[in-house]
Every structure is written in C-alpha cells, then in structure tokens.
C-alpha cells in the first residue's frame, strides 16, 4: 500500500475533527463499568418549575442552558422524578426534541424514592415529598414512594413517560428505604435491567453499611449491582471519606457527588454574601450558610490559592474534587456558569496545596441521608 493510501486511511474525518474541537469536557469510566460519563455532569435540580422552589429555572430559561451544555460536550444529565414534581424530566425531554439531540448521544440519569404529587395537589417546595409517613395514609400516595417492587415499577414507568424515552441509562435510588426488604428492592431493580427499561443502576446518599448490604446481596444472587454512588462531598463536607468513599474505591463504584461547590459557598469569599435566590432561601440550618468559623477558614484558604494561581475560587474546589471522584454533578443557572466550570477541566493542585486545604477540616453532623 502506497504512502498516499496510508495517509488517506489515517486521515481524521472532518466531522470527527469538528466534533472534537467543540467538545470541552473529558469522559471518564463510571467506576469499573464500561459506560463513560462527562465531567462535569449536569444537575437537573435547577431545571423545571420555579413554583417548586424559587431558584429553579423555568422551561424558557432552562432550554438554552441544556443546549449549551450539550454543544460543549456535557452529555450526561442527572435529574430525579421528584425534581420540580416531575417537571425537570419533562423539560429535559422537550430539550432533546427541540434541539434534535439523538437519544443515544446523551446519558440520562434519574431517581426514584420520593413522592411525586398529583398535578392537582402540587405543593411548592418539598410539599408531600418529605412526608412519607403521611403519604402512606393517603389513597392517592400509598405505594407511590419508597423502594418496594410496586413503587419502583410505578416510578420508572412514570419517568420513562415524562422523559419521552423507552430506557433510562442510569436509574438511581434516591435514598435507602428501611421499610422494605433489601431483596425486594434489588430483585425489582434487576428486573428493570433485564427488561431493558434501565441499563445501569446507581444509588445516592445513605449509610455505607446499607449500600454494602445491597451490593453484597446482588452479588450473591447474580443480580445487577450499582455502578455509581451520588453522595454529598466537597471541601467543606468530607464525612463520606470515613467509609463510603473508601468502600466505593475498593469495589469499583463510580463517585458522582452532589453539592461539589457547597451550594456556591466554595466559589465566593467568606465576607461575600450570596446574591442568588437559592442561597437566600437556604439559610435554614444548612452547614453552608450557618455562621461557622471553621468553614470560613477553609473557604479563605480556597480564596488564597485562587489568588496565587489567578483562578476563580470554584476552580480550586473542583481541582481538589476532580482528583477524587469520577465527575461532580453541577447545577448551572447560566451559560456563563457552564463556561466557568469547563475552564476548570484539567487543572490540578500540588500536594502541598491539597494538604493546606484539608488540614483544617473538623467532623460535622451527617447531612443528606434522609
């Protein structure tokens, strides 16, 4: 074969070159499984209906953000059935249709466990979602939440309809359900995979012994195991390092943490008050907004390193986190926030800088398991 022929065979197609030039992220295996997800992952909590929470983006504001994320390579989108009472999933489906995004080119992640209200009973904020003990007393909501076989199948069928798809890439349990036998939950989840409704399984915040028990049972029965853990982890909240992160690393489970910037706390100076609607509505016991000298000292060190490196503070926090996880889940309120997060890709801290950021950490009450 002539050199010219070899050159033609090796020549990169223009379409591939164009695609690579537009891709601003890297893709990482989700733990030990074969699926690759974008870093970062787009968080859908911010998308849906501002009636649910005032800082949530309505459809007309969310659509261009979803388009901008996809155009830049953020092809992994995380949501939950309960986000905006199902509206988050619906907006994502509309974006795929409006922008002609092929279903096979995005990774859709959603969750089950909490109550999704009937539309006529839709309450702002948490509403019924946080009152499971009362939901079980209602003819409308009994078997509509939790991790029973009935609740899981009800949830996945509803999510498939809202998302406008016949399969979910990663179906996650939002929390652990102590009222249901683990075998019932894991058997139902395995059946979803075998039926083709779900391709991978993931889990979210819970105690490590609970997660390990579910994984061990699935392994013993030959059922599908979880490939990801979506836990609460950032420079301010590191309780997950005690057990969950070690367990996941040892067993090949991918880590995709929520609140990587501590609701923006790690992206602004200690003296700087947030002007976001979300922060102004979250000062109700959150560890991020409470008066806490230890948190302020950690954030001050983030700022110090950011100034030295001429980086935004968010890049320092993300550089520290990206070394330890598969990909953080970030909620974007503007295209500018997407650009800022993507500019952090590939940035690394020195070992001395990492120690400097970590050494002030003090134990905190567990948050996010309920």
From Swiss-Prot:
It is an enzyme of class 1 (oxidoreductase). Substrate binds at residue 174. Keywords: NADP, Oxidoreductase. NADP(+) binds at residues 78, 204-205, 230, 259-269, 333-341. The keyword NADP applies. GO terms for molecular function: oxidoreductase activity. The keyword Oxidoreductase applies. Its EC number is 1.1.1.-. Pathway: Secondary metabolite biosynthesis. The active site is at 83 (proton donor). Belongs to the aldo/keto reductase family. Aldo-keto reductase; part of the gene cluster that mediates the biosynthesis of sansalvamide, a cyclic pentadepsipeptide that shows promising results as potential anti-cancer drug. The nonribosmal peptide synthetase NRPS30 produces sansalvamide by incorporating successively one phenylalanine, one leucine, one alpha-hydroxyisocaproic acid (HICA), one valine and one leucine before sansalvamide is released from by cyclization by the terminal C domain of NRPS30. This is Aldo-keto reductase NECHADRAFT_45914. It comes from Fusarium vanettenii (strain ATCC MYA-4622 / CBS 123669 / FGSC 9596 / NRRL 45880 / 77-13-4) (Fusarium solani subsp. pisi).
């Amino acid at each position: 074969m002539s050199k010219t022929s070899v050159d033609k065979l090796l020549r990169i197609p223009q379409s591939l070159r164009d695609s690579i030039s537009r891709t601003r992220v890297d893709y990482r295996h989700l733990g030990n499984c074969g699926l690759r997800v974008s870093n970062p992952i787009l968080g859908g909590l911010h998308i849906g209906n501002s009636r649910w929470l005032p800082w949530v983006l309505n459809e007309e504001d969310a659509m261009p953000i979803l388009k901008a994320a996809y155009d830049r390579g953020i092809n992994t989108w995380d949501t939950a059935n309960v986000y905006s009472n199902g509206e988050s999933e619906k907006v994502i489906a509309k974006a795929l249709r409006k922008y002609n995004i092929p279903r096979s080119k995005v990774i859709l992640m959603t969750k089950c466990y909490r109550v999704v209200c009937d539309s006529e009973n839709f309450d702002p904020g948490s509403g019924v979602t946080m009152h499971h003990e009362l939901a079980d007393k209602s003819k409308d909501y009994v078997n509509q939440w939790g991790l029973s076989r009935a609740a899981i199948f009800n949830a996945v069928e509803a999510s498939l309809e809202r998302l406008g798809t016949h399969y979910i890439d990663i179906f996650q349990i939002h929390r652990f359900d102590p009222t249901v036998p683990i075998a019932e939950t894991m058997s139902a989840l395995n059946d979803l995979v075998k039926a083709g409704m779900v391709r991978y399984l993931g889990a979210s915040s819970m105690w490590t012994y609970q997660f390990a028990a579910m994984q061990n049972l699935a392994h013993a029965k030959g059922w599908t195991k979880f490939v990801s853990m979506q836990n609460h982890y950032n420079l301010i909240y590191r309780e997950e390092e005690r057990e969950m992160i070690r367990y996941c690393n040892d067993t090949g489970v991918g880590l995709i943490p929520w609140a990587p910037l501590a609701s923006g706390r790690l992206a602004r100076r200690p003296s700087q008050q947030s002007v976001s609607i979300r922060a102004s509505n979250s000062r109700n016991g959150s560890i991020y907004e409470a008066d806490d000298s230890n948190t302020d000292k950690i954030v001050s060190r983030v700022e110090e390193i950011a100034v030295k490196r001429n980086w935004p503070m968010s890049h320092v926090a993300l550089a520290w986190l990206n070394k330890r996880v598969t990909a953080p889940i970030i909620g974007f309120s503007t295209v500018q926030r997407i650009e800022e997060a993507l500019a952090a890709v590939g940035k690394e801290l020195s070992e001395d800088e990492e120690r400097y950021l970590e050494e002030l950490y003090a134990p905190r009450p567990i948050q996010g398991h309920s």
